[in-house]
Amino acid sequence: MKHSRGVLIVFAKAPRAGSVKTRLCPPFTPEEAAELYARLLSDILAASAEFVHELELEAILAVHPPQACGEIARVAPSRFRVVPQRGADLGLRMAWAVREACAGGAARVLLRGSDSPLIDCEVMREALEALEEADLVLRPDQDGGYGLVGLKRPTPGLFEHPMSTDSVLADTLAQAARAGLIVRVLAPGFDVDTPADLRRLEVLRSPRLARLCPATLAYLDERELWRRA
């Protein structure tokens, strides 16, 4: 498929107890953490479906593990094309996604995770505009990683470093410098990984947040999980 302007690729995992949001356990059970992730994913996909319409992007949902594609496709908005992630680790899977999108003709590629609920349409617009001059755009998270990546072309080696550490941003920036990329770093956001992140989410509660993640907030309210965060 040819891409006229660009592509948004959402990276997602199957919401399996014991394999997602494990840093929330305790105080939550693995089942509660998995359901919270499922709600986050639902909210992020619904919001992203609106964003890609406004920004004229193609929407791709890259799923891990590959055998979960059918399950996730049944609950994903119809705007998304669901594909399996390919690669032995997250960095290789991200590199694969960028290569595939660019091979299809994408001039700009955005990658986002499925646990950063405050990435809204304006953040994505800012990233796309930054790619007019920058080769790489990153939106940092509070834990040393990032929740949004923008690229104009594949860059070998960019993500070839450990991805589950507090130095992910620094490592990616170092690889970008070696490759001679022009980099733009956006204002930081945060992702939901720990009880402290949930407490921050409650502090930031607002009409904007309610629009971005209604199912997540409803689950936290219904189960009174705020009290254990």
Describe each region flagged by the PLM.
Residues 57-65:
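Short beta-strand/loop segment that forms part of the nucleotide-sugar
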Residues 37-55:
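A short, N-terminal amphipathic alpha-helix
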Residues 156-175:
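Short, glycine-/small-residue-rich phosphate/pyrophosphate-handling segment
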Residues 71-108, 165-168:
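Short phosphate-binding loop-to-helix
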Residues 110-112:
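Short aromatic-hydrophobic micro-motifs that form the base-stacking/packing surface
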Residues 118-143:
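Conserved donor-nucleotide/metal-binding helix-loop-beta segment in metal-dependent transferases, i.e.
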Residues 1-23:
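N-terminal nucleotide-binding beta1-loop-alpha1 segment
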